[in-house]
């Protein structure tokens, strides 16, 4: 069994393989990153009841499916044909559809109440233009949600970015805020942080847990249990301070 390929997919749905470009559900070793992304989707879904939602760069489609639990209509858009086909086959419910397209050009002006663009702004060559395009897609009173990793917690100390080859640029809080404000009149910035088991794990590491489990030779079995047990309850969103946030989530209007 390939540890980097999705397990137990529905009949007729081709599994996707991890490439580092996007996270996936149903890959036990990837569960931390999947839940970290999913936590933000769930938070947005709770605020999108009855809305017309556009989920840009939806990838595997799991986030679009979460949004569709509360929204009136969700369209998930991705430019990767393999991911698009997987999402279209796997996630079927009334009000949910998937389209193949480019985030820079998809959509008609004023067509959506909510635009979602998570963990992708760091991948695009002209982020300001993309955000201006999203602004044009919003109906009056609409909101765009954009998230990106915090370079200060993702990259090595002092580095301009992490070693993720898919990331063209990574942002500090003030840089990401300025980027969003270049396209939107109103921007509220939140940070995603560890909570629950992950917060306890952070504290344990500061007390030397990494040396202890290495010395006891239980690293592999411990994380073989711990990583699959992580849930979205092990993350929380709050406004400040943002220096140590895992990810930034911008609410733009």
Q: Where are these predicted regions, by residue range?
A:
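Conserved S-adenosyl-L-methionine
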Residues: 185-196
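C-terminal helical/coil "lid" or tail adjacent to the Rossmann-like core of SAM-dependent
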Residues: 200-230
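A short His-aromatic
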Residues: 119-123
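Conserved N-terminal segment of class I S-adenosyl-L-methionine
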Residues: 1-110, 114-118, 128-131, 166, ...
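Short alpha-helix
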Residues: 168-183
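Class I S-adenosylmethionine-dependent transferase superfamily signal
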Residues: 67, 134, 180
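Short, glycine-/aromatic-enriched active-site segment of Class I SAM-dependent methyltransferases
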Residues: 146-169
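A short glycine-rich, Lys/Arg-flanked "PGG" loop and its adjoining helix->strand segment in the class I
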Residues: 128-143
């Amino acid at each position: 069994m390939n540890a980097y390929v999705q397990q137990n997919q529905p009949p007729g749905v081709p599994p996707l393989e991890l490439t580092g470009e996007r996270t996936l559900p149903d890959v036990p070793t990837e569960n931390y990153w999947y839940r970290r992304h999913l936590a933000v989707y769930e938070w947005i879904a709770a605020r999108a009841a009855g809305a017309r939602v556009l989920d840009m760069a939806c990838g595997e489609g799991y986030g679009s499916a979460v949004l569709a639990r509360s929204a009136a209509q969700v369209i998930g858009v991705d430019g990767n044909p393999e991911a698009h086909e997987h999402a279209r086959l796997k996630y079927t419910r009334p009000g949910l559809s998937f389209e193949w397209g480019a985030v820079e050009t998809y959509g008609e002006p004023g067509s959506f109440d909510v635009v979602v663009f998570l963990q992708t702004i760091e991948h695009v060559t002209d982020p300001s233009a993309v955000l201006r395009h999203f602004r044009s897609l919003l109906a009056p009173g609409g909101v765009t949600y954009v998230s990106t990793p915090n370079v200060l917690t993702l990259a090595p100390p002092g580095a301009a970015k992490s070693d993720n080859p898919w990331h063209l640029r990574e942002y500090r809080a003030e840089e990401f805020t300025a980027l969003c404000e270049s396209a939107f009149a109103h921007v509220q910035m939140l940070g995603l942080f560890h909570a629950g088991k992950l917060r306890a794990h952070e504290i344990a590491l500061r007390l030397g847990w990494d040396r202890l489990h290495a010395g006891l030779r239980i690293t592999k079995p411990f994380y073989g249990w711990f990583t699959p047990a992580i849930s979205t309850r092990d993350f929380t969103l709050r406004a400040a301070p943002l220096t140590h946030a895992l990810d930034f989530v911008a609410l733009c209007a």
